[in-house]
């Protein structure tokens, strides 16, 4: 009995010391604050929308209203259409000039994550349609795994990597290598535009 108790006590002491050596897994600031700081650091103009789920990923979108197109849609009574099946028909050649114009410009899509794998899984699918970025806590960028696995993948997919220090100050660690490359315009990009347009109007109304 005494031997078992001693081993348990020793293991508990080791676990406690290990926990003190590990950095906190909590983010240094709220997701919304870190996302806004990252958008500013990257020079993304527009509104930083609340976190939303797109393509099954939890991301933060930065977008701006296209004033002329928005005004035209108001005049036509063309509200945002979030139904993906409906929007998929808007790119058909026979509907050219007969569908509402895109009313927002997506400046970027980012993920605020505790681990780089989560961040890249969330943002890489959007790289075809917008600039992308991942914000990580500072300690996540100090690991061997980050250096040998994360950085090469981020370069390959053109994802900006940023880190947040314990005070929540965000710095750019790795800029995108795909800046200026043309973005795809297809049924998915048109649908993303409509969903973001809908969220943009909801956000503006809520803050009014």
Question: Locations of the language-model features?
Answer:
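Non-catalytic C-terminal interaction segments of nucleic acid-processing enzymes
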Residues: 93-98, 139-141, 146-208
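A broadly tuned "polar low-complexity/structure-edge" signature
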Residues: 51-55, 60, 125-136, 141, ...
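Alpha-helical protein-protein interaction elements
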Residues: 36, 84, 118-121, 183, ...
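Catalytic cores of nucleic-acid endonucleases
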Residues: 80-157
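Acidic-basic catalytic patches of nuclease active cores, encompassing PD-(D/E)XK
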Residues: 1-94, 199-208
């Amino acid at each position: 009995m005494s031997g078992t108790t001693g081993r348990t006590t020793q293991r508990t002491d080791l676990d406690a010391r290990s926990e003190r050596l590990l950095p906190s897994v909590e983010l240094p600031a709220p997701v919304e604050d870190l996302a806004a700081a990252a958008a500013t650091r990257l020079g993304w103009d527009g509104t930083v929308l609340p976190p939303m789920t797109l393509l099954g990923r939890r991301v933060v979108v930065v977008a701006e209203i296209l004033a002329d197109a928005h005004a035209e849609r108001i005049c036509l009574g063309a509200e945002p259409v979030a139904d993906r099946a409906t929007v998929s028909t808007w790119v058909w050649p026979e509907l050219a000039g007969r569908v509402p114009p895109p009313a927002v410009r997506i400046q970027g899509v980012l993920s605020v994550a505790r681990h780089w794998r989560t961040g890249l899984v969330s943002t890489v699918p959007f790289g075809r349609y917008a600039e992308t970025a991942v914000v990580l806590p500072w300690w996540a960028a100090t690991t061997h795994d980050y250096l040998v696995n994360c950085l090469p993948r981020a370069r390959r997919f053109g994802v900006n990597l940023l880190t947040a220090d314990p005070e929540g100050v965000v710095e750019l660690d790795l800029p995108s290598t795909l800046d200026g490359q043309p973005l795809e315009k297809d049924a998915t990009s048109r649908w993303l535009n409509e969903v973001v347009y809908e969220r943009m109007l909801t956000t503006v109304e809520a803050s009014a």
